[in-house]
């Protein structure tokens, strides 16, 4: 007799977009200038950066600045915010930095500060 683990899910989709830990303590923020300077064509690393989305290039692509450096960011399609953003809105972005010809951060989550 072979026993295999089985998962059973009752009814539909259980992915709550608002689910997760609501942590309000300190967060290690990456220095954007250092991340860019230390990158190569194949660099991929998780980052948390704080600053502003200063220009929209496409429906999900923006220019982000921390006040010292700029980088292109692409927002995940699943990101939904309760409030609109503008070029003066201070945000914290959680995502993955990717080096290359056009270094960018693929943003998984935005926190309005």
Question: Can you say where each PLM-predicted feature lies in the sequence?
Answer:
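Sec-dependent N-terminal signal peptides of Gram-negative exported proteins
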Residues: 1-4
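OB-fold and OB-like single-stranded nucleic-acid-recognition modules
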Residues: 6-113
